[in-house]
Design a protein with these regions (language model features):
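N-terminal membrane topogenesis motif
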Residues: 1-23, 79, 83-86, 218-241, ...
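Signature of the first transmembrane helix
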Residues: 5-66, 100, 130-131, 237-255
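Interfacial transmembrane-helix starts/ends
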Residues: 7, 44, 77-94, 102, ...
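Interfacial/gating helices of multi-pass transporter permease domains
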Residues: 32-52, 180-186, 225-230, 253-282, ...
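Helix-loop junctions and terminal segments of transmembrane helices
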Residues: 59-74, 282-306
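Short membrane-interface helical motifs at transmembrane helix boundaries
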Residues: 98-121, 327
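Membrane-interface junctions at transmembrane-helix termini in multi-pass inner-membrane proteins
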Residues: 134-156
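Hydrophobic alpha-helical transmembrane segments
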Residues: 156-170, 178-208
């Protein structure tokens, strides 16, 4: 990957990330005035559950696909890259479908026994329906990132945020017009609709690419083994991080209650911290996360071509830039 292409991809993803986060900042202000800090707290309680499920079913496969597609494309093995994409997407969709059914069916257990908040049961059920759509969207993103085409992931990121904000505002207006209580359900519904829109957009774009959807897959078992060999350690890593984050989500409100806060006050304080303060603190990470996403396929390409000196150089340069940016 040329420097120009790398910086262009990083610029596109960074711009999309900045626009999305700015919109998200005002979106959280809107939520704070509509569902309140307690509603944001309930919403923030169930969001890590989605991250945990996607960590188990999709994130590892997504990263593996980006790396494999880039490697096969660099070696001129276009069909191999497309076969990996199709099998990986089907595998992620299958796993996320099982997870969605399980969590939807046992939503009362997760709400009462895990999150210790019975009010989150309906939120968990609706959120569970979004898992397969999120898997499709993430896998299609990995396909385009593997081809080093950052424009599609950047565009869908903005589309997803726009749909989330618009649909939540629309549901809020509907609730007001019909005298229905405004709860955290409108935020979860907005999240579900945004994932649905991103998945539909991804499906349309892939359907227009006839080479991806028409040919026969050769050696599917070998492809599954190749994807699994790379995705398994990545999945375990993301799963461990998600489990730790989920434990934090459960413990913080409980500890706040232990120190004298009421359940409502604990949720409100937790909502202010995770829904409003923390996103502002993590705002600068947009640049580094965009660079890391673009680096994955480019390093995979250089490794496939045997350019190990370039890998060491780009690793040192990137680490230095991130340290300077963080300081």
């Amino acid at each position: 990957m040329s420097k120009e292409r790398f910086f262009k991809g990083t610029f596109l993803l960074t711009s999309a990330g900045l626009i999305s986060r700015i919109m998200g900042f005002f979106y959280r202000i809107f939520l704070s005035h509509t569902i309140g800090a307690e509603g944001i707290g309930l919403y923030q309680l169930v969001v890590p559950l989605q991250h945990l499920v996607l960590a188990m079913t999709t994130f590892g496969i997504q990263t593996a696909l980006s790396r494999l597609i880039s490697s096969h494309t660099a070696l001129g093995e276009k069909k191999e890259a497309q076969d990996c994409f199709r099998i990986g997407t089907f595998l992620a969709l299958f796993l996320s479908g099982i997870a969605a059914w399980s969590i939807f069916t046992f939503s009362d257990f997760f709400a009462v026994q895990i999150l210790k908040e019975p009010a989150t049961e309906s939120l968990i059920r609706l959120l569970a329906l979004s898992f397969p759509f999120a898997s499709v969207h993430l896998c299609v993103n990995s396909y385009y990132l593997g081809l080093k085409k950052a424009s599609f992931p950047a565009a869908t990121q903005i589309l997803e945020q726009l749909v989330r904000i618009f649909s939540t505002c629309l549901l809020w207006q509907i609730c007001l017009s019909r005298n229905i209580a405004v709860t955290a359900m409108i935020a979860v519904a907005g999240s579900f609709l945004s994932e649905l829109a991103a998945a539909l957009c991804s499906f349309i774009c892939i359907s227009l690419n006839s080479s991806v959807s028409s040919h026969h897959i050769e050696k599917p078992v070998q492809k599954i083994s190749e994807i699994g060999h790379m995705a398994l350690p990545l999945t375990l890593n993301r799963l461990l991080l998600s489990v730790l984050a989920a434990i934090e989500v459960v413990l913080i409100p409980q500890c706040l209650r232990m120190y004298g806060l009421s359940p409502s006050e604990a949720l409100s304080l937790y909502g202010v911290f995770t829904g409003m303060a923390l996103p502002c603190i993590l705002f600068p990470s947009t640049v580094t996360s965009s660079a890391s996403v673009i680096l994955m396929p480019s390093v995979a390409e250089m490794q496939a071509l045997g350019h190990h000196k370039k890998i060491r150089y780009i690793t040192r340069t990137t680490c230095t830039a991130c340290i300077l940016l963080g300081s």
